[in-house]
Amino acid sequence: MTMSRISHIELDDSNLPPPTPEIEQERKVAIYDLLEENSFALPARDDRAVPEGPYRVNLSIRDKRLVFDIQTEDEEKAAEFHLSLGPFRQVVKDYFQICESYFNAVKTLPPSQIETIDMARRGIHNEGSRVLQERLDGKAEIDTDTARRLFTLICVLHFGG
């Protein structure tokens, strides 16, 4: 297993309302999948040495910005970066709307219609992960699957359930 990965992730959701059961389930699955397999590296910046991973990541929203607080396993500060939430707003909103449709569809619609909604949901999810990768460019290197799982967690934080 590579050292350039996330070994622990925490969401600072202390100022958020409790999540719905569906959102809590999405969160648990995303965290489990993320910790099982991910790729997360901090590129060298300027002339500073970058502490090697694995990393502990704390995700939070402060002053309308998404904050990645990254530490080594020994809890030594490795990096911190703040991303504007603006570029995420529409895709997060679209993702939650399609998820709501999906959760409702699962209860009442035939599999063929559920599959159509699920394909749209995956497409929006892919768009969100692409936006995240763009926003992290030069700050952190992540693969597509890691971006997808982190995007799910950003959605949980962004809308607070």
Curated annotation (Swiss-Prot):
Highest taxon, organism lineage: Bacteria
Taxonomic source organism: Ruegeria pomeroyi (strain ATCC 700808 / DSM 15171 / DSS-3) (Silicibacter pomeroyi)
Protein name: UPF0262 protein SPOA0072
Listed HAMAP family: UPF0262
NCBIfam families linked: PRK02853.1
Assigned keywords, A-Z: Plasmid
Region annotated Disordered, chain positions: 1-21
Family (UniProt): Belongs to the UPF0262 family.
InterPro entries on file: UCP032146 (IPR008321)
